[in-house]
Amino acid sequence: MSGPNGDPDISAEGIIEDEDEFNEEEYAAIDSMLDQINSCLDDIEERNDALNGKLQELLESNRAARRDFRQQITDHADLPPPANDDDEDEQSRDAQKKD
């Protein structure tokens, strides 16, 4: 018969019980592995913090560049457009045709 979640009914046999004993060597090995994992996680956290700092600097630099670019566009929008050499050549040709 299955349980309330559809899981099969499993007997308690084969399940680790609190009575199981680990010797000191096994505890030391587990402790060593946990220390290594902790060290790796600390290293990952440091790298993550460094990358986050660099990304924040890049983001601020990008914002400043966009702000400067917008300001340049605004400043240049107030100026008349530069004369185009093609327009002058066309006007010269039109004047020559009339003569």
From Swiss-Prot:
Taxonomy, superkingdom: Eukaryota
Native source species: Danio rerio (Zebrafish)
Parts forming coiled coils: 34-71
Protein's UniProt name: Bublin coiled-coil protein
Any one Gene Ontology BP term: intermediate filament bundle assembly
InterPro entries with a match to the protein in the record: BBLN_eukaryota
Region spans: Disordered: 66-99
Basic and acidic residues bias spans: 66-78
Keywords for this protein: Cell junction, Coiled coil, Cytoplasm, Cytoskeleton
Subcellular location as annotated: Cell junction; Cytoplasm, Cytoskeleton
Molecular functions per Gene Ontology: molecular adaptor activity
Function field: Essential for intermediate filament organization in intestinal cells, interacts with intermediate filament and regulates intestinal lumen morphology.
Family the entry assigns: Belongs to the UPF0184 (EST00098) family.
Matching PANTHER family: BUBLIN COILED-COIL PROTEIN, UPF0184 PROTEIN C9ORF16
GO CC annotation: anchoring junction; cell junction; cytoplasm; cytoskeleton; subapical part of cell
Keyword Cytoplasm: yes
